[in-house]
Amino acid sequence: GQLFLYDLASRKASPLTKDFNPNVIDAVWNRFNGQIYILCEDEDYQRIYTCDPANGKIKQVAASEDIIMSYALADNAPVLFYYGQSASNANRLYAYDLKGGKNRLVYDLSQDKLKDIALGEVHDWNFKSDDGTTIQGRYYLPPHFDPNKKYPMIVYYYGGTSPTNR
C-alpha cells in the first residue's frame, strides 16, 4: 500500500511514499511528536518507519526484532511499544524511547514458549541471478550443527512483493 497526506483546504492528496519501496501496512499519526509511524513489509522483514509530514522524510526505527507484529504509541510521552519476533525467538514486547532511540525489553514470551526447544543458527545467504538481480535468502542450521556431517538443507529465498516472514 501507499501513504497519502490529504490537505483539507486544497482538497488535494499528496503521496508520502511514492518513492518508498516497502509496502505500507498501517500508519498512525503521533500526537506527541507530530510524526507518522508506518508499519511496512520490507522484503522479508516487517519494520517500523517514521515519516515527517512537513518534509516527507522517512527513517527506519531501530527495532530489535525482524518482524514487528503490532505497535502502539503513547499520546503524551515519547514512547513506542511494539512486539515482534525473529528467526530464533517468539514474541517479545519492547518499549522504544522515541527521543533516545533505545529499546527496552518489557516482556519475553519467547522464554516460556521456547524453553524446551533447541534452535540452530540462521544465516543470510544472498546470491546474484543470471540477470544480476540480488536474490535474498537464508539457510537454517540444525541445533548442535557439526560441519563434518551431512544434513538435508532447507533454503528460503525472497522472490516477491509480499514475503513469507522470516
Language-model region placement:
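Serine-hydrolase catalytic core recognition
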Residues: 70-166
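Short, solvent-exposed loop/turn segments at conserved positions within beta-propeller repeat blades
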Residues: 1, 41-46, 86-89
